[in-house]
Swiss-Prot record:
It comes from Methanocella arvoryzae (strain DSM 22066 / NBRC 105507 / MRE50). It holds the Pfam family DUF134. This is UPF0251 protein UNCMA_27150. InterPro entries: UPF0251, WH-like_DNA-bd_sf. Belongs to the UPF0251 family.
Length: 166
């Protein structure tokens, strides 16, 4: 019997439960979305990464990635259309922790990345300026930047079209 490959997941969700408003939890059917199914949606739909690249990031075949993505989309659609709660839990995954955040120095235009789980840098590593900004439009998808946050773990504001200090 073939042993299931653990999928690599970059960012764990901050919220793990979603339910329709104004419907008591006791009246709701709950759909379980695994962490790796959520990661497939995040990579393909939110970050708009090609499926073959997303499969490589998760350490699985394209077919397995496609199957996970289809299952996840079906579960989310079922919950939204039929008013069900979504619980994100379980799965067979390894936290790879490769979520990155890009920063841009306003003084020297130096661009660099930091891991998501590290403290926000205080100054530019190249020139030492404190005029640094979280760079928007970093491949995380338009909706992601419009929401204004890079990710739940980092919690830093993104700079999209308008220049906002972080």
């Amino acid at each position: 019997m073939v042993r299931k490959v653990k999928r690599r997941v970059s960012c764990l969700p901050k919220a793990t439960y979603y339910k329709p408003r104004e419907i008591p939890l006791c009246d709701l059917e709950i759909i379980n979305l695994s962490v790796e199914e959520l990661e497939a949606i995040r990579l393909c739909d939110l970050l708009q990464i090609a499926q073959d690249e997303a499969a490589d990031q998760m350490g699985i075949s394209r077919k397995t990635f496609w199957n996970d993505l289809q299952k996840a989309r079906q579960k989310v659609a079922d919950a939204l259309v039929n008013g069900k709660a979504i619980q994100i839990s379980g799965g067979d995954y390894v936290n790879s922790g490769v979520c990155k955040v890009e920063f841009l120095c306003q003084k020297c235009n130096h661009l660099w990345e930091t891991p998501c789980n590290e403290k926000r840098p205080e100054n530019c590593p190249k020139c030492g300026s404190e005029s640094i900004y979280r760079k928007g439009g970093d491949g995380r998808g338009k909706r992601h930047t419009e929401r204004g946050f890079c990710c739940p773990k980092h919690g830093d504001r993104a700079v999209g079209d308008q220049e906002e200090s972080v």
